[in-house]
């Protein structure tokens, strides 16, 4: 089944201030010699929750798209973090805060750091089945507090950061997006489920033992070489399926991952080295928001590629999506300064 392309009508981000993760580790007594991850990571403050960061990102995306919240038919929340446990809904809270109508449906989805790409695919199909219109894909993570910066064994996770990003998308709605989403392809590695996990709070271990931090996230049981091999195989398979499905020749990659080395592995596997938009140097690894923060930067930098790949993954699934430029449309006036700014200011899109 071939769907009409999904217009990327607007993209907005909301990012807390970055911190130096090496300084945090040093202050907690961990050695930083040989650390290979991102140096900076955005860390949220008291008012930075998935719903509050998410609605700020969505409001900026709506302004960028010149669309009102009342026009949204679907809001997908694609983060793993939540203000409260289920069945409390982050997407529905974002709808309430943004002023969406009762005709809008809120859905919370989860696929780790891959969820924004799966969200774009889901929104595409949902809008097609429901006659078109506008939807929002919102990703927000607040997970820096789950990382032990004093544990050298967790150094691969030190750069986990907090933040949010949102895309307003449209199908057959006369949107004026510069890029159009054609679709995505995915490959899974289910044996890697749980490679990064929080041990406590679920039904298997609802309460942590005395003296144990119940929120602590850790890496479990895989060597780096195993993980890199899985990433190479997963991305290669997903990308081959994408290229077989769509004839466009991609010339740019938007991707951010847990470390510069992992981004390099992905870009080389996709043969898009030196043609990659990366944001980890400023933000760290944000999970679901990464791909939209990168897309916002790509749009701000006004590249002229005809086809762009979005790449994202969790440890257990890998995906690539394809965006193509719509050259038939007149460019709109600039909406404001770049959204991924130097340290020292709250980062977002100023309409």
Question: What name fits each language-model region?
Answer:
Residues 8, 48-111, 117, 245-263:
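Conserved beta-ketoacyl condensing-enzyme motif
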Residues 28-33, 85-99, 137-146, 261-272:
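Acidic-glycine-rich active-site phosphate/pyrophosphate-binding loop
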Residues 110, 135-141, 169, 309-313:
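Short beta-strand segments
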Residues 1-50, 153-229, 326-351:
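Condensing-enzyme catalytic core mediating Claisen C-C bond formation in acyl metabolism
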Residues 55, 81-83, 87-88, 101, ...:
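Claisen-condensing/thiolase-fold acyl-transfer catalytic domains that form or cleave C-C bonds
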Residues 35-41, 74-76, 96-109, 146-151, ...:
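Glycine/charged-rich beta-loop-alpha catalytic/anionic-binding loops adjacent to active sites
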Residues 124, 128-163:
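Flexible, glycine-rich active-site loops centered on histidine and acidic residues
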Residues 2-6, 70-73, 101-104, 129-135, ...:
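Short coil/turn connectors at secondary-structure junctions
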